[in-house]
């Protein structure tokens, strides 16, 4: 058998230098590593990796070029009780693969074995890693670096956002190309968002259970290859990387940042009955949190949990993040189930991965957003992430819904959440922007469904409506479903307007779910992770244009209010905020805790938000001075209101002084 040259231990993965390819693989417990390369007919040739520096195996294959398909067979002990599951019969993906050929199918040959190893060779059906050359001309691309105080995030799915857009060329709808098309860029600018946050774009797989049901994983939270773009949204797998970078470049030219939702908490290998295609066969003990009995700690609900306190896995995670920043110029990340990142196994603010990110000059300067929980003991960590992380604020989400949709919530609690939840986030030197405020997200009801459904309707997911949360804090306004008489539809509209105004005019970083500005509905499905169909795709032809205009006007208004864009905590007497009752007097202690849901919020001494969240029309006395309602609550030529606003039930209006 031909020998490989010894090569180098860095950089990690498969690196083409113009003359050949250097291969590396981390495995602390392997006894031998074989590089397997495949020709166009699927014939396999194996080479032992001859070099080892620390826990990194390496070798250099002269003459190898981009397009070469390869994988690894890793030899070592089969000792499940100790967490070792080496099985050289299974061809394994390179964790650093930049491109993958083939899908992860529900095939018996892909299972490595439970108690005993499965020695059937899987090369015929296993996905293959592919060597790439990632040269790209970024021209004059520059990161927008929008300050947190001026950031407005728009969470979207690559396919669902554009698949039904009638103004886009048919062949690019639902693809990376569509994201940077002038039609979409113009829409983003008109709406006023500053950052496009994409659901996972790293290559993912559909779980075997879904495949057997004829469904697919639509959202993408089942990662298969963390460095490779999901190929289904590109013209071809070969062009995916450049098409994505073209989109990033176009968005940057328009001043729009790109944030990636990334899944560093588990892999698509799932539990012990899941497929063995990469990490489990490379070094199960190092990559995953292993219980004393050899099974996995399942703090993710997905069968396994990545051990992000292990030095080799910390390095893997950081290199992955740096790859997306340096090679694809993304501007930040939203981390799924991010409490896993801080597990040691208990959560710690000085966990190894947090320390590594903070020390990295590349990663510490991009936007980092945590989903601050997992399902394990001690997994709920809202407010506890270290700088420079921002966090999804579920306190804001729940409080906004409970305030405007008939639930029990005090004025004081609402004000606290409106003020960026300072009781939660004003620590460790963090600014208000650390509170990422949201009403809705990809998981849960859409905003329209929040006002149309009291109960989830997830039957299409095939789990007899057991999946998805039951804590929706929603209100159908008297009738379950989308339709209803005119007065009911008007009440729903008013609730949506009030909720959007609360989101977009509160302190903190607002995140808008794509489609909420259209009135998009998922017909009560609050867990549409497996619905790659018209239920989740945005229907641009049926979009509520008036609601879109209303939302855009709110975002424009937000950018005019220094108290919101300054990203500094409000202090008494600083001129940023005053909290008033319906008579324009400071709220009393009793009104904060027991009063009706009536208040006025004066921002920057110029903008007044009058709130009537009661069920009755109520007169609200405005502060001294001349006030006029501003768009989207009135036209440009608005009469001056000098004294009283007659606030409709569940109503909100914004006035500007003078």
Swiss-Prot record:
Alphabetized GO MF terms: glycogen debranching enzyme activity; hydrolase activity, hydrolyzing O-glycosyl compounds
Pathway: Glycan degradation; glycogen degradation
EC top class named in words: hydrolase
Chain positions covered by the region annotation Disordered: 459-484
Catalytic activity, reaction form: Hydrolysis of (1->6)-alpha-D-glucosidic linkages to branches with degrees of polymerization of three or four glucose residues in limit dextrin
Active site: 336, 371
Keyword Hydrolase assigned: yes
Keywords from the named record: Carbohydrate metabolism, Glycogen metabolism, Glycosidase, Hydrolase
Record EC number: 3.2.1.196
InterPro entries assigned: GlgX_C, GlgX_Isoamylase_N_E_set, Glyco_hydro_13_cat_dom, Glyco_hydro_13_N, Glyco_hydro_b, Glycogen_debranch_bac, Glycogen_debranch_GlgX, Glycoside_hydrolase_SF
Keyword Chaperone annotated: no
Marked site (Transition state stabilizer) residue numbers: 443
GO biological process per UniProt: glycogen catabolic process
Family: Belongs to the glycosyl hydrolase 13 family.
Function according to Swiss-Prot or TrEMBL: Removes maltotriose and maltotetraose chains that are attached by 1,6-alpha-linkage to the limit dextrin main chain, generating a debranched limit dextrin.
Alphabetized PANTHER family for the sequence: GLYCOGEN DEBRANCHING ENZYME
Name under which the protein is recorded: Glycogen debranching enzyme
Source organism of this protein record: Salmonella newport (strain SL254)
Gene of this entry: glgX
């Amino acid at each position: 058998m031909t020998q490989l040259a010894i090569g180098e231990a860095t950089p990690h993965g498969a690196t083409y230098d113009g003359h050949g390819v250097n291969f590396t693989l981390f495995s602390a417990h392997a006894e031998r590593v074989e590089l397997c390369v495949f020709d166009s007919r699927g014939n396999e040739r194996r080479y032992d990796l001859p070099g080892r520096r620390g826990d990194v195996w390496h070798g250099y294959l002269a003459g190898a070029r981009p397009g070469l398909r390869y994988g690894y067979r890793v030899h070592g002990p089969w000792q499940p009780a100790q967490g070792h599951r080496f099985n050289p019969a299974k061809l394994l993906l390179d964790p650093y693969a930049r491109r993958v050929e083939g899908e992860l199918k529900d095939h018996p040959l892909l299972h490595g074995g439970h108690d005993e190893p499965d020695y059937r060779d899987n090369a015929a059906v296993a996905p293959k890693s592919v060597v790439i050359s990632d040269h790209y001309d970024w021209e004059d691309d520059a990161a927008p670096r929008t300050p947190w105080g001026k950031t407005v995030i728009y969470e979207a799915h690559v396919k669902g956002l554009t698949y039904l857009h009638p103004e886009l060329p048919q062949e690019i709808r639902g693809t990376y190309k569509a994201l940077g098309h002038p039609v979409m860029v113009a829409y983003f600018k008109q709406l006023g968002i500053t950052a496009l946050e994409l659901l996972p774009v790293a290559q993912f797989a559909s779980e075997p259970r879904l495949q057997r049901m004829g469904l697919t994983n639509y959202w993408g939270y089942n990662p298969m290859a963390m460095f490779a773009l999901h190929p289904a949204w590109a013209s071809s797998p070969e062009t995916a990387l450049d098409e994505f970078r073209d989109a990033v470049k176009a968005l940057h030219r328009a001043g729009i940042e790109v944030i990636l939702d990334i899944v560093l908490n588990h892999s698509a290998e799932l539990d012990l009955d899941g497929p063995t295609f990469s990490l489990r066969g490379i070094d199960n003990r190092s990559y995953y949190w292993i219980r004393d009995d050899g099974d996995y700690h399942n703090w993710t609900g997905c069968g396994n949990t990545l051990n992000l306190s292990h030095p080799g896995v910390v390095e893997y995670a950081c290199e992955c993040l740096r790859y997306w920043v340096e090679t694809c110029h993304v501007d930040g990340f939203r981390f799924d189930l991010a409490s896993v990142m801080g597990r040691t196994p208990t959560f710690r603010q000085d966990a190894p991965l947090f320390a590594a990110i903070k020390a990295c000059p590349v990663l510490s300067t991009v936007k980092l957003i945590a989903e601050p929980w997992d399902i394990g003991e001690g997994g709920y960590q809202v407010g506890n992430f270290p700088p420079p992380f921002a966090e999804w604020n579920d306190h804001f989400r729940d409080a906004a819904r409970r305030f405007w949709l008939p639930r029990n919530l005090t004025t004081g609690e609402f004000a606290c959440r409106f003020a960026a939840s300072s009781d939660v986030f004003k620590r460790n030197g963090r600014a208000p922007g650390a509170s990422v405020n949201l009403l809705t997200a990809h998981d849960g009801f859409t905003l329209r469904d929040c006002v149309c459904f009291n109960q989830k309707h997830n039957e299409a997911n095939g789990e007899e409506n057991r999946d998805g949360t039951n804590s929706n804090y929603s209100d159908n306004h008297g009738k379950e479903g989308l339709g209803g008489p005119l007065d009911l539809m008007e009440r729903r509209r008013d609730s949506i307007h009030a909720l959007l105004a609360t989101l977009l005019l509160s302190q903190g970083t607002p995140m808008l779910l794509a489609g909420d500005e259209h009135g998009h509905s998922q017909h009560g499905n609050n867990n549409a992770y497996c619905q790659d169909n018209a239920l989740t795709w945005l229907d641009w032809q049926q979009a509520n244009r008036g609601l879109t205009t209303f939302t855009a006007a709110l975002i424009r208004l937000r950018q005019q209010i220094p108290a919101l864009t300054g990203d500094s905590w409000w202090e008494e007497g600083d001129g940023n905020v005053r909290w008033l009752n319906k008579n324009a007097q400071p709220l009393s202690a009793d009104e904060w805790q027991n009063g009706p849901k009536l208040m006025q919020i004066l921002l920057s001494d110029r903008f007044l938000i009058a709130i009537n969240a009661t069920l009755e029309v109520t007169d609200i006395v405005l502060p001294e001075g001349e006030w006029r309602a501003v768009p989207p609550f009135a036209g440009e030529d608005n009469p001056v209101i000098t004294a009283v606003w007659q606030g409709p039930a569940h109503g909100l209006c914004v006035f500007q002084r003078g």
